[in-house]
Amino acid sequence: MKKTFAILALGLTAIAGHAATPLWMRDVQISPDGTEIAFCYKGDIYKVPVKGGTATQLTTQESYECIPIWSPDGKQIAFASDRYGNFDVFVMPADGGTARRLTTHSTGELPSAFTPDGKYILFSASIQDPANSALFPTSAMTELYKVPATGGRTEQVLGTPAEAVCFDKAGQQFLYQDRKGFEDEWRKHHTSSITRDIWLYDAKTGAHTNLTNREGEDRNPVLSPDGRTVYFLSERNGGSFNVYAFPLAQPREVKPITSFKTHPVRFLSMSDGGTLCYGYDGEIYTQQPDATPKKVAIEIVRDDQPQFANLQPSDGATSATVSPDGKQIAFTLRGEVFVTSADYATTKQITHTPAREAGLSFAPDNRTLAYASERGGNWQLYLAKIARKEDPNFPNATLIEEEVLLPSTTVERAYPQFSPDGKELAFIEDRIRLMVLNLETKKVRQITDGSTWYSTSGGFDYSWSPDGKWFTLEFTGNKHDPYSDIGLVSAQGGGKITNLTNSGYMSGYPRFALDGNAILFTTERYGMRAHASWGSLNDAMLVFLNQDAYDKYCLSKEDYELRKELEKEQKKSAGKDTPKDENKDKKKKDDKKDSNTDKKDDQPKDIVVELKGIEDRVVRLTPNSSDMGSTIISKDGETLYYLAAFEGGYDLWKMNLRKKETRLLHKMNAGWADMQLDKNGKNLFLLGSRKMQKMDTSSDALTPITFQVNAKMDLAAEREYMFDHVYRQQQKRFYNTSMHGVDWDKMTAAYRRFLPHIDNNYDFAELLSEWLGELNVSHTGGRFYPKGQSEPTASLGLFFDWNYTGKGMLIAEVVEKGPFDTANTRVKAGTVIEKIDGVEITPDADYYTLLNNKARKKTLVSLFNPQTKERWEEVIIPITNGAFSNLLYARWVKQRAADVD
């Protein structure tokens, strides 16, 4: 996008029409006859002769295809595809051709194996635990299902996680790897009680036998053609994943088959003739168990083009700020800076880089914008200015000039904020120190020394006082990390932070209010506290910096009105005492001054700070604690606006501080949103990711703020930036200075070479997980969350009996507070659902299609009681699977409480 992109000519795409050697080939599986290998590359499925050569592309959709599974006769390949928003199981001819969709539930469904007779495909998915299951209800812990290879009703095989299934020839037993927890599957060298083990399941007896049972990773089992030997992947002997084997009858007699170093062996499979096949370091190998590995030489012909995306989003801002005059909104979206008009959709793109920009601040002149950018590998401060004086604002500007401030390759500077007079710029240095830059002299002074903030994940909240002489900030006192307090410190530098809260609990989001005479903040001191990192409930609080402001706040409505009248009279009296000639001159000056209230506001009074007794001037504003978002107090100091979530998203609440009256002002259902006032306090801006709106504070009327973005994104450059970002973050902030013995630079180079072979976010997230997995720490890895399901499956709030094979669906349990848990329903356990919206459910029917896109819509359910032979109908409103998940959690908590009563 910019000149920096020129260095990206490192082969990010293959030359059109020419054969290239692929890397990062995943989901490798050899055919049953051992002549071909199927694999996934760049989101498509290919196959190649086992001896190597040019691979044949089998899928050509824009969607992502992965996990090819051969049928026993080698004539079909099952695979996963996200063509409908989530991963479903499909099947296609082994030579390519039209694929048939087999699963329709909106959860992710990933194929594992064909049954030996080829009639069914087993897959893992989180659809429904058995009603009697005691497992924690989470989508991370899947169940095992099977679906006919020709299509039809899904049946549950196991109610517990069972991955990488491998059948014996008779189909009576199968091997599988378990899953006990949430650890990233690509983590390496992990030893704990939740690492995977290999199990043998006997379908006749229902018995599960743990064959490995150790605190280390053992996974991906395959059975030898004679059924006597288990081959699997393991990190035994202190190395990375390699192929090992043991006799099925004597699982303790483990021996190594391969001895690869540095990187893991992945995706083990075996042909009917006993040829092993697997992936290593992005390439494919075959091997006879008693021989040495052979790399399969592969070429792929692709007509790849440079990856650019033209994005035209209408929402999705990740941060936003309003200009002082209230006429412009600056926001970041996908890491770029944009400015839109508050009244029109006209929008200007300010930055064009693959790097991330963040931390927006308008100067008082409304023509200068400060932000931080990580371009060049280090967070730096930038100023964007409207170049031509003829251009009225950013959205309509023709030329934008950009300037980097205090350039450095080692010191990070971010989170800029202009001083009220626009002459200085505050910022956070190296994520822990508050600094101020004089924009004229370029001199920098230190406000805090970094000893009061310990987190390096980002900066901290701070705010200038209206007179520019103070900062309020969140800080950590007495090394009480991570519990932050609210502080006050001089903007001149060299001063100590005064702790204004001393609560011992989380306090944050400070901002000045009441013309700088008080500080508004939120705290969990009265609500649910984050003792175990399960979240907290907060209140809005004020700390008054002087007694006069506190006394004024404490006045009743009547006394407050009397005080305002008295102040008016005193002002008039002061005018009368002035000599006549001076009075005339003063009146002329006052008239001129009153004609421009903005100029008057530009000269704020000095704030009086009285620290003595300040601990007694801390006031709780909100009547009850809540999941609280942004808070702000009106210009006149009489109204508190705050965002709180009691059900669903965040809604806007309004509180009259004098009358102590609170009401729901607007139902917003917002994700995140920040609230800001324009300079005169006439408009309140609600700036969120889902929508941005402007509210007239006199009428409370909302007006939408729209924008028109047409941005061209270099996707390959974005991925390279993210890769570099991860490298730097780990290098700077990994808790262990030796990086757990990993040569981080060498490992980074090893994984960087795969970037040209990745053109989608699924593969990129997996690459990050593999790479970060080398460090062997929890809570790391890459994640990609697609936009969502195109056909979300609704829930009836029921458990079904998976052993039932007749017409309809047999209810095993009605979940409390679900759609059927009503006073008027006749539905109970044992009832059969025969039809949904008049469509009969036959024994072999896939009924999930009848529930897709039905959440929150009236649905007719036809029911039958096998005991009384009665039939009837009920109209219910299905819920989302997310809502059903919440009900299951409440049910699980009650059941576990009953277990210990």
What are these regions (language model features)?
Residues A20-Y46, D315-G335, T622-E638:
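Beta-strand-rich domains and repeat architectures in extracellular enzymes and scaffolds
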Residues K255-S269, T498-Y509, T622, G629, ...:
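Conserved blade-ending motifs and adjacent loop-strand segments that build the rim/top face
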Residues A297, V301-P306, E561, D700-E718, ...:
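C-terminal, low-ordered peptide segments at domain boundaries
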Residues T21-P22, C40-Y46, T59-E65, A78-F90, ...:
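A flexible loop/linker signature enriched in serine peptidases of the S9 family
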Residues P756-K807, E870-A897:
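Extended, small/polar residue-biased N-terminal targeting/export presequences
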Residues A19-M25, G53-A55, V301-A317, T398-L405, ...:
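A short helix->beta-strand "capping" segment at the edge of beta-propeller domains
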Residues E791-P843:
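PDZ/PDZ-like domain segments forming the peptide/carboxylate-binding groove
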Residues Q29-G34, P68-Q76, S112-Y120, V165-Q173, ...:
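Blade-terminus and WD-like Trp-Asp/Gly-His loop motifs, strongest in beta-propeller folds
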